[in-house]
Structures are given as structure tokens and as C-alpha cells.
């Protein structure tokens, strides 16, 4: 699983904060033994399971899973699945699966069979960085094998081609190329002191601002291709500058402009792509709110975001969530979930649960 340091730095140079309280000097043998004892005999000690898996990095968890098999000849996911149930079981399985494979499996399920879960495709791919997309594409091949699909022509991109249509498909295919411009982390760190103009070509920014206006507001109909080209290829810093200059020049935010010129899944995907570039933690905070607001909770999305972001930027996401809602993510989780499932989610966001 490759991870770029650029994922933890914002367009203005701020460093995003995680929530996972990782125990750095863990002994994977001891952790495996504790998990085995927690499931041994009659009943299961869920708190001991949470005490281990709620405080280990994704890398540590995979090592623990391997060590469990080496010590006991059993698969840890299989054992936990037989001892737990419901959302708690699903969350444990997510924690013991490589993050990229977890996302790849979600995409496969979103497109298999009759009907398509467009919201999952949008949530996973429109928020992902170049390296995350490349890792998901690789993991998707492993997921296909897990489901008994050996056709070498089947890829994530080919499934998207078959399942989606129109400008929404074009946007997703463009994102899958993972060609967004990036700058070295060391230069990105200096943006807070030197300003965004130090890392972007302002002449190109002005050209892009005019192109986006001409592709939407200034014409009858919308030139989706021109919009897609800019939003999926320019760096997050460049897009930040575009948004600032667009509003200054035309008196309307880029988000509002694109929302007025697009619709449906294409609009949702385009706006999430843009919002992720402008403020990644805010984009995820909005997704978490959407997952919990209203009747019922979208637990799969809630779990997937918390598992995938707790080591990267979930602390910053929590700050944005509370800023926009006036109440904390912890409060919402306590209200919307229950039992051991709630305890494990709270552990992952760095809150007290015992």
C-alpha cells in the first residue's frame, strides 16, 4: 500500500491530523495471543479485541493477522467473523483488510449485478489521490480473483466503461488515469509562508478561469470535456487559485457555477472532486454527515471513511465536522450507533469508549 505525504497537507500548507492512537511498540505475537484468548472458550471478550485492533495501524493489523495464522493455523478474519456479528463484525473485517482492497471491494460491489451504486463510486474515487487510485486499481485485480474472475481484460476501468455512461463515466475514467499534477512535499510545506502563488502558474490560472466560464455560464449547454480536463489534471493548489480568481472575476463561486450547469451523478462527482481539492477534510466531513443524517445510517460509508482516514486526516475532518455542525463527530457516533460497534468507532476517532 503506497501512501504519499501529500495526502496529509492542505492547499494552504496546513498539515492534516489523524485520530488513531497507535501503540508504536506493540508485539504482534502478544497481540495475536490476546485476540486468541479473547475468543477462546465460551463467550467473547469484545473489549480486549477493541483494545488491540482499535489502537494499531493498518500495517500493524496486517502483521497481527499474519502472526495469528502462524501461531494458530487459523485466519483471524474467519475467527472474528464466527465470534461477532452485525456492524461490529463488518468493521473488524474492514480493519483487517488492506485499505486499498477495502475500497476496491466496495467499487466491485457497487457495479456488480443489476443496478449501480453511484454514490459509492463517487465517494471512493472522487476523493482519492493519484497514489490511492493506482493502489485501488491494483487491488481491484485481486478482488476480481477473489470472486473467481480470471479474465485478464477485466479491470476497474473496463468495469467502469461497461457500467457507467455519459459525462459521469468520462469524469470517472479521467480520474482513474491518476494524472493530477503534484509538487514535492517539501515545496508544499512552504506554502503557508510563501503563499499559493509560489507554486502555481498564475497565467495558466487565468486561462483556466476563462475556460471554465466559457464552458458553462457563457454558453448554451455545457462543455463537460473542458471542465473535466481542468478539474482532474490540475494540482490542488492550482485549483485553489482557480476558485479564488473565478469568484473574484465573475462574482460567483466556482462551486455554485458548476452546480448550476450540471446535474445528476455528474454534478455530484464533479462537486466532490472540486471540494476535495479545495478542502479535503471538509469534503469528508460532509460525506460523514450525509451518511448519518436523516432516517437511518449509511454504516458502510461511515465505516469506510473512518477506517481509511483515521491514520491520515480524520482529526482535521473531525474539526471541520464540528465547525459546520456545532456538535462533534463523537456526539453523532454516540447517537447513531450502539454496542461494540460504537465502542470501536470511538476508539478509531480517538475518543473514550470504555
Curated annotation (Swiss-Prot):
Q: Does the keyword Metal-binding apply?
A: yes
Q: Where does Ca(2+) 5 bind?
A: 292, 294-295, 336
Give binding positions for Ca(2+) 4. 118, 265
Q: Which InterPro entries match?
A: Annexin, Annexin_repeat, Annexin_repeat_CS, Annexin_sf
Cite the GO molecular-function annotations of the record.
calcium ion binding; calcium-dependent phospholipid binding; identical protein binding; phosphatidylserine binding; protein homodimerization activity
Q: Gene3D superfamilies from the xrefs?
A: Annexin
> Subcellular location, in the record's words?
Tegument; Secreted, Extracellular exosome; Host cell
Could you give one GO CC term from the UniProt record? Answer: nucleus
Keywords from the UniProt entry: Annexin, Calcium, Calcium/phospholipid-binding, Metal-binding, Repeat, Secreted
The reply on keyword Calcium is yes
Q: What happens when the gene is disrupted?
A: RNAi-mediated knockdown of this protein causes no morphological changes on tegument structure except that the tegument surface appears smoother in some areas. Has a significant effect on worm development and egg production by female worms in vivo. Reduced number of eggs in female worms, reduced number of worms in infected mice, reduced number of eggs in the livers of infected mice, and reduced hatching of the mouse liver-harvested eggs into miracidia compared to wild-type.
Binding of Ca(2+) 6 occurs at 296, 336
Give the domain of life: Eukaryota
Q: Where does Ca(2+) 2 bind?
A: 44, 46
Q: Which Pfam families match?
A: Annexin
Q: One of this protein's GO BP terms?
A: female gamete generation
Described by its record, this protein's role is as follows: Involved in reproduction of the worm. Involved in host-parasite interaction. Delivered into the host cell by means of parasite exosomes. Binds to acidic phospholipid membranes in a calcium-dependent manner in vitro. Causes aggregation of liposomes in the presence of calcium, but not in its absence. Likely to promote membrane fusion. May provide structural integrity within the tegument.
* PANTHER family attached to this UniProt entry: ANNEXIN, ANNEXIN B11
How are the domains described in the entry? A pair of annexin repeats may form one binding site for calcium and phospholipid.
The family line of this record is: Belongs to the annexin family.
What's the name of the protein?
A: Annexin A13
Q: What is the lineage of its organism?
A: Eukaryota, Metazoa, Spiralia, Lophotrochozoa, Platyhelminthes
Amino acid at each position: 500500500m503506497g501512501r504519499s505525504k501529500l495526502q496529509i497537507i492542505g492547499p494552504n500548507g496546513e498539515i492534516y491530523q489523524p485520530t488513531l492512537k497507535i501503540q508504536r511498540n506493540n508485539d504482534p505475537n502478544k497481540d495475536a495471543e490476546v485476540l486468541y484468548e479473547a475468543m477462546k472458550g465460551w463467550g467473547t471478550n469484545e473489549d480486549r479485541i477493541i483494545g488491540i485492533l482499535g489502537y494499531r495501524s493498518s500495517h500493524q493489523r496486517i502483521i497481527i493477522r499474519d502472526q495469528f495464522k502462524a501461531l494458530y493455523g487459523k485466519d483471524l478474519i474467519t475467527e472474528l467473523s464466527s465470534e461477532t456479528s452485525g456492524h461490529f463484525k463488518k468493521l473488524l473485517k474492514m480493519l483487517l483488510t488492506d485499505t486499498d482492497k477495502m475500497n476496491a471491494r466496495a467499487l466491485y460491489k457497487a457495479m456488480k449485478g443489476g443496478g449501480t451504486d453511484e454514490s459509492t463510486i463517487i465517494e471512493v474515487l472522487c476523493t482519492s489521490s493519484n497514489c490511492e487510485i493506482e493502489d485501488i486499481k491494483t487491488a481491484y485485480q485481486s478482488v476480481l480473483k477473489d470472486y473467481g474472475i480470471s479474465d485478464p481484460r477485466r479491470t476497474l476501468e473496463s468495469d467502469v466503461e461497461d457500467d457507467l455512461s455519459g459525462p459521469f463515466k468520462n469524469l470517472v475514467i479521467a480520474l482513474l488515469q491518476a494524472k493530477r499534477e503534484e509538487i514535492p512535499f517539501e515545496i508544499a510545506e512552504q506554502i503557508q509562508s510563501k503563499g499559493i502563488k509560489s507554486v502555481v502558474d498564475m497565467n495558466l490560472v487565468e486561462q483556466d478561469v476563462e475556460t471554465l466560464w466559457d464552458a458553462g455560464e457563457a454558453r448554451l449547454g455545457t462543455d463537460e470535456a473542458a471542465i473535466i480536463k481542468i478539474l482532474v489534471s490540475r494540482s490542488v493548489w492550482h485549483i485553489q487559485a482557480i476558485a479564488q480568481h473565478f469568484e473574484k472575476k465573475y462574482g460567483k463561486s466556482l462551486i455554485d457555477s458548476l452546480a448550476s450547469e450540471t446535474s445528476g451523478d455528474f454534478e455530484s462527482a464533479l462537486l466532490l472532486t472540486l471540494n476535495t481539492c479545495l478542502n479535503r477534510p471538509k469534503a469528508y466531513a460532509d460525506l460523514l454527515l450525509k451518511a448519518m443524517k436523516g432516517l437511518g445510517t449509511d454504516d458502510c460509508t461511515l465505516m469506510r471513511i473512518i477506517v481509511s482516514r483515521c491514520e491520515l486526516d480524520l482529526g482535521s475532518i473531525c474539526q471541520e465536522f464540528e465547525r459546520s455542525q456545532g456538535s462533534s463527530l463523537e456526539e453523532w457516533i454516540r447517537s447513531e450507533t450502539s454496542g461494540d460497534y460504537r465502542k470501536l468507532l470511538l476508539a478509531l476517532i480517538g475518543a473514550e469508549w470504555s
